[in-house]
UniProtKB/Swiss-Prot annotation:
<keyword id="KW-0408">Iron</keyword>
<feature type="glycosylation site" description="N-linked (GlcNAc...) asparagine">
    <location>
        <position position="407"/>
    </location>
</feature>
<keyword id="KW-0503">Monooxygenase</keyword>
<dbReference type="GO" id="GO:0016020">
    <property type="term" value="C:membrane"/>
</dbReference>
<dbReference type="InterPro" id="IPR036396">
    <property type="entry name" value="Cyt_P450_sf"/>
</dbReference>
<dbReference type="InterPro" id="IPR002401">
    <property type="entry name" value="Cyt_P450_E_grp-I"/>
</dbReference>
<feature type="transmembrane region" description="Helical; Signal-anchor for type II membrane protein">
    <location>
        <begin position="2"/>
        <end position="22"/>
    </location>
</feature>
<keyword id="KW-0472">Membrane</keyword>
<comment type="pathway">
    <text>Secondary metabolite biosynthesis; terpenoid biosynthesis.</text>
</comment>
<dbReference type="GO" id="GO:0016114">
    <property type="term" value="P:terpenoid biosynthetic process"/>
</dbReference>
<keyword id="KW-0560">Oxidoreductase</keyword>
<keyword id="KW-0812">Transmembrane</keyword>
<dbReference type="GO" id="GO:0102614">
    <property type="term" value="F:germacrene A acid 8beta-hydroxylase activity"/>
</dbReference>
<dbReference type="Pfam" id="PF00067">
    <property type="entry name" value="p450"/>
</dbReference>
<dbReference type="GO" id="GO:0051762">
    <property type="term" value="P:sesquiterpene biosynthetic process"/>
</dbReference>
<dbReference type="InterPro" id="IPR001128">
    <property type="entry name" value="Cyt_P450"/>
</dbReference>
<dbReference type="GO" id="GO:0020037">
    <property type="term" value="F:heme binding"/>
</dbReference>
Amino acid sequence: MELFTIFSIVVSSLILFTFWSLKVPKNLPPGPPKLPIIGNIHLLDKIAPHRNLRNLARKYGPIMHLRLGQVSTVVISSPRLAHEIMKTQDLSFADRPTTTTSQIFFYKASNIAWARYGNYWRQMKKICTLELLSAKKSRSFFYIREEELTRTYKFLDFSSGTPITLRDTIQEMVNNVVSRATLGDVSEDRQFIIDSTYTMLKSFNSFNLFNYYPSLSFINVISGKQAQWLKMHKEVDVILEKILREHRSRPRGKNDHEDLVDVLIRIKETGDLDMAITDDNIKAIILEMLTAGTSSSSMTIEWAFTEMMRNPKIMKKAQTEVRSVVKGDRVTEADIQNLDYTKLVIKETLRLHGVPILVPRENQEDCVVNGYDIPAKTRLLVNAWACATDPDSWEDPDSFIPERFENNSIGYSGADFEFIPFGAGRRICPGMNFGMGTVEYVVANLLLHYDWKLPDGMKPHDIDMREITGISTLPIHPLKIVPISLSK
């Protein structure tokens, strides 16, 4: 079967390549030579593609053309050109490409991140911005963060003085926060759906050859890959159907907390909508909350502690600030507003370790960018990490220096294109408030209640800073550190 699959790809691609090469526009952006059939796929590093794309951009320029299989792709690697794409010509590049995995896993790509640009996306973005992920709604889940952090304290106090794998601890806590905010406190299927979405996310982010050969999608069926994805999706769908039934059937009191599923059901059944939304649309949004909401927040927290353990003076400075500002035994929302240096640490963490390559964009009409022709249906990648480490925008860009953000107005809103961890323009991530609320609260409380040290015999420079890439980057080896409880 594998030999047949490979043979089918080779033969079909040779035919398609012949026709494609005859109609290549002559004024494309510069880029490396393209090989027959595969184009430039061989140049992509599966572990850290943002790094070798930055290296290629240093040779071919901040706007670079690649052919990945059959997909004509333009890579943007500078703040100036990111501004051109996501500000000046934002509307032209507001669409998303169609991929097999987004169609299957997210109910015909009806989640916010992968939905095609149009009336449906605008409506769902508005619902998410005003109802699901607003600053007010994020604050309403503060009690969940407190309760889950209390559970984490018990584990850390018990483990005081012994090494722990921080990733496991943080992921469990963030998973519980996000799943309770999304599904509620009473769902008995929370753990199953969390485990299933992680498995699904791993498949979604894995290198999928067929996303680069869209005309050969039939091979997904022949190879059995599509059957695996559909089976995985069906298992998740059964549980999501059950969750929706439970939410619709349970009685609600006036003082009950409204989780995100409750909000979506209420809007579907009583909202004044321009377009009706379906249960499948709701399920797509649920999955998006559980995947993007958990992975990005937990990885940011792990990277923040990885960098602070590697830079003990920064750790000490952040701890001193937290312990001088916070007067009680728990960080409050008001306290967080006064933790200026701790916020700089998180901001610098996101500069170096945020989402490296933004969700792909696609133009529906021919465009011109920086004097180059960009044909319709070109896939466009913005290398946010390359922008955040651009030597023309940052001094000593590869070093972790939180103080670089002092006395400037660079923020998360997407107005400063040298720093776009949540994207920019129409497609900026609507979950920014929710994610940052969780990250700031957790980091501050862990600095307040614990001292942290490396395992015996390990020095700061021994920490492995290599990374692997999914939605976000994460350390290739999970950070092991020793919590020292201050309450003992």
